[in-house]
Amino acid sequence: MMKMLIKLDEERVRRDGKYKLADMWRVIDAKFDKYDCIKERQADGAVMYSGNPNRDYYTCINLAYLTLKGQRWFAEYCNQWIWYDNDDDEALPFQNLNVLARERTDNPLFAHA
């Protein structure tokens, strides 16, 4: 199973006024809705998207990653982005990859965010 946790700096989005927060989440949600991923809002405002085991969640989560890593607005306002994977073995613990830290190192869009 794969999961992806995303958190935006919602306070800064509102303060800056460049984008509408609802529109940002609508775009992000759309990346996961196509494959019926399960969306869970966390207490801290982050959103956990979990793959639907009855759909091709591998493609879904990979396409979401590939799309979001190219979005300047996402790079600017994302403050948590973690990919969880247990290699489809429910007996294994999830490994997590701090995607945001990696993108800040490797992706010029995220370098100055």
Q: PLM features: what roles do these ranges have?
A:
Residues 30-50:
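Short, glycine- and small/hydrophobic-rich beta-strand elements in well-ordered beta-sheets
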Residues 52-113:
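Long, continuous compositionally biased terminal/linker segments
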Residues 29, 33, 62-65:
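Generic solvent-exposed, charged/amphipathic alpha-helical segments
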